[in-house]
């Protein structure tokens, strides 16, 4: 680790030890596991994240691009507060979902309709199912080394390198986690 990485005696290290007693590996997402311990965030503003030890980082990840407008943007905060006052997470349809779909379809020429999902993983699962139905083919391709959520058939070859790529006409599929189905590598 670099000299700026929080030390083993840091607050991040303490939180990691504490978290391991109630959360596997001490964090709620496997994508943030870093050895010897993850960096725990205290707060963020704009493009900058500050950890629990007071170290400041430029956030180039932006929660895997879901925070493209930056953290704690005043306009976003205002819109969220306004919606909170009206209620959230209805299990019924709302006009706002139609308004957002119309806005997106108007701005993206190739988009005729849109389906909203609860997570990127759920969106990938739906996209794979739709692709299989449309093409009537069982196999899919995926960007090598890229993260596409935690769905079994997308959570593969995340840590690949030239030593395990396989042949150009027969690439290797490397399961990312234990419990991946055997069909993943068939």
PLM segments and residue spans:
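Active-site-adjacent loop/helix segments that line or gate small-molecule/cofactor pockets in enzymes
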Residues: 2-43
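Electropositive phosphate-/nucleotide-binding environments in soluble metabolic enzymes
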Residues: 9, 13, 43, 70, ...
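Short, hydrophobic/aliphatic alpha-helical segments
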Residues: 10-18, 48-55, 105-106
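Active-site and channel-lining beta-strand-loop segments
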Residues: 38-61
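Short beta-strand-to-turn element immediately C-terminal to the catalytic PLP-Schiff-base lysine
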Residues: 50, 69-70, 156-157
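Glycine-rich loop-to-alpha-helix module at the N-terminal edge of alpha/beta enzyme cores
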Residues: 56-137, 141
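PLP-dependent aspartate aminotransferase-fold enzymes
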Residues: 102-186
């Amino acid at each position: 680790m670099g000299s700026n990485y929080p030390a083993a005696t840091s607050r991040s290290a303490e939180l990691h030890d504490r978290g391991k007693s109630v959360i596997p590996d001490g964090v709620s997402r496997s994508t943030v596991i870093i050895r010897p311990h993850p960096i725990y965030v205290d707060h963020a503003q704009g493009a900058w994240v500050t950890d629990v030890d007071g170290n400041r980082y430029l956030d180039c990840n932006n929660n895997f691009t879901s925070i493209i407008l930056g953290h704690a943007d005043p306009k976003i905060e205002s819109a969220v507060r306004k919606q909170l006052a009206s209620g959230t997470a209805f299990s019924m349809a709302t006009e706002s979902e139609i308004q957002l779909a119309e806005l997106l379809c108007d701005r993206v020429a190739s988009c005729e309709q849109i389906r909203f999902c609860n997570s990127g993983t759920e969106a990938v699962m739906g996209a794979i199912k739709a692709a299989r139905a449309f093409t009537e083919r069982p196999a899919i391709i995926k960007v090598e080394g890229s993260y596409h959520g935690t769905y079994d058939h997308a959570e593969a070859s995340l840590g690949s390198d030239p030593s395990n790529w396989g042949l150009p006409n027969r690439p290797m599929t490397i399961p990312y986690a234990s419990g991946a189905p055997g069909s993943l590598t068939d």
